């Protein structure tokens, strides 16, 4: 069966170990990827309306059915995104 080998994308490719190098923990990776996936999803939704508020995928999408989360994970792995860690401390309430 030549030509039927699946090329894994998304959760299995890129490997989780490579993705964890871009963040502090697996929890921040989940939030990081989910926020970017929401931006990509909003970009595709707004295309029909003629609005260009969000930035589209920064990596080439060869499959039209590729999920926004898979695209976000590939962007993180490629080093195309940056994120800032926010301090958890809140100012005292007066």
Swiss-Prot record:
Sample GO molecular function, one term: DNA-directed RNA polymerase activity
Pfam families in UniProt: RNA_pol_Rpb6 (PF01192)
E.C. number: 2.7.7.6
Classification via SUPFAM superfamilies: RPB6/omega subunit-like
One Gene Ontology cellular component annotation held by this UniProt entry: DNA-directed RNA polymerase complex
InterPro entries in the cross-refs: DNA-dir_RNA_pol_omega, Pol_omega/Rpo6/RPB6, RPB6/omega-like_sf
UniProt keyword annotation of Nucleotidyltransferase present: yes
Keywords: DNA-directed RNA polymerase, Nucleotidyltransferase, Transcription, Transferase
Gene3D superfamilies: 3.90.940.10
Catalytic activity as recorded in UniProt: RNA(n) + a ribonucleoside 5'-triphosphate = RNA(n+1) + diphosphate
GO BP, sorted A to Z: DNA-templated transcription
PANTHER family membership: DNA-DIRECTED RNA POLYMERASE SUBUNIT OMEGA
Family: Belongs to the RNA polymerase subunit omega family.
HAMAP family: RNApol_bact_RpoZ (MF_00366)
Record function comment: Promotes RNA polymerase assembly. Latches the N- and C-terminal regions of the beta' subunit thereby facilitating its interaction with the beta and alpha subunits.
Record's subunit section: The RNAP catalytic core consists of 2 alpha, 1 beta, 1 beta' and 1 omega subunit. When a sigma factor is associated with the core the holoenzyme is formed, which can initiate transcription.
NCBIfam families documented for this protein: rpoZ (TIGR00690)
Name by which UniProt lists this protein: DNA-directed RNA polymerase subunit omega
Gene: rpoZ
């Amino acid at each position: 069966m030549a030509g039927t080998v699946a090329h894994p994308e998304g959760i299995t490719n890129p490997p989780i170990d490579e993705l964890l190098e871009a963040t502090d923990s697996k929890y921040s990776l989940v939030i990081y990827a989910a926020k970017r996936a929401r931006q990509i999803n909003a970009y595709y939704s707004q295309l029909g309306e003629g609005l260009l508020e969000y930035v589209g995928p920064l990596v080439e999408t060869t499959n039209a059915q590729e999920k926004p989360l898979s695209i976000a994970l590939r962007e993180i792995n490629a080093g195309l995104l940056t994120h800032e860690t926010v301090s958890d401390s809140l100012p005292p309430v007066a």
